[in-house]
Amino acid sequence: ADNLSKVYDVQKKRPGLSGSLRDLYSPVYEKKVAVKDVSFVIDEGELVGFIGPNGAGKTTTLKMLSGLLYPSGGSVSVIGHDPWKREYDFLKNISLVMGQKNQLWWDLPAIESFNLAKDIYGISDSSYKKTLNNLVEMLEIGDVLNVQVRKLSLGQRMKAELVAALIHSPK
């Protein structure tokens, strides 16, 4: 990422009923800077964590790196791709886990979501079994693979979300 920035146009709300009506027909916008001139390099295989207060731009930056948001300024290259072009070769090699988003089907056992990911990503049976076994052992969730996701504790669900995000061995 080089001088990565994201600026949103946010509607300014006017008080009262008359203000709400005016906002409906003639909204007023102000600029909200979410990310300002962020630059960094992450080498392949390097683990990185984003920490900071609410509103610091962590999620916005991750969304730009994954191609979910187009930056207002700067440039990004992730494994040799422009993320917002959403190329298949790029998408099959990344993963993003966010606390509010679920990859697991709520009404099915976690293993069914993993099996679906296997088919979506075209993972061979042998590679899938090896990766699944490694992740399940590392995260110690073997005893809950066949439990309906809605019945898992938050910790168990987060571990299962990690398995779903990593099952295709993203770069």
Show where each model-derived region lies:
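Pre-NBD coupling/linker segments of ABC/ABC-like ATPases
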Residues: D2-A34
